[in-house]
Amino acid sequence: MPQNSPIEKLTTAVFGFALAVGALSLTAANPETTADVVGGLVLFSLSFLILVVIWWGTSDIMSKIDHGRPVTIFLNIVLLFFVAIEPYLLNILNTSAELFPLSSTLYAIDMAFLMGLSAALCHILIKENKATLTAQQLRHFTIGRTNQFVCAGLFFLSTVPQFLEWTLAGMSVRVLIWFATLAFSLTISAKNRNK
């Protein structure tokens, strides 16, 4: 992506906004118990890590892709929409136990779309640049794309109603799937960067 291109500026602004609003949402939570404080910090940490990982990956992809193509612009704008609504959903997760079933489902769908769209952009990068990428770069982006698609699938899987009802150590299995997905993604990404 050319330095300071309009899409780069928009991407940086939207991701920065989402991270800032997510942090501010913690102040609106009005926790009443230690569990509320810990729960809010845990959910914010998950959100923060996912957004940073997607921002980092999207920046890497967009620096190597023809971002002037209509499909690339469309996918990037849709991705930014899902980034922009993430803090709103996170805020509802942190402030309303009554809305947790709905807000956690919407949050999982939002995360699935974020990861799926990132994977789609990576797929376009691979397709457009297969002839010019080194074998190592091709492997790196292929693993990254597959990792993102798998994570998108895991977030969609977490919307199954039983995962909301079941708990483990007092935490919803849905949220545990989110953390397992993040751990899986970070592990694969770290191994992929070290090769």
What are these regions (language model features)?
Residues M1-K195:
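Multi-pass alpha-helical transmembrane bundle typical of ion/small-solute transporters
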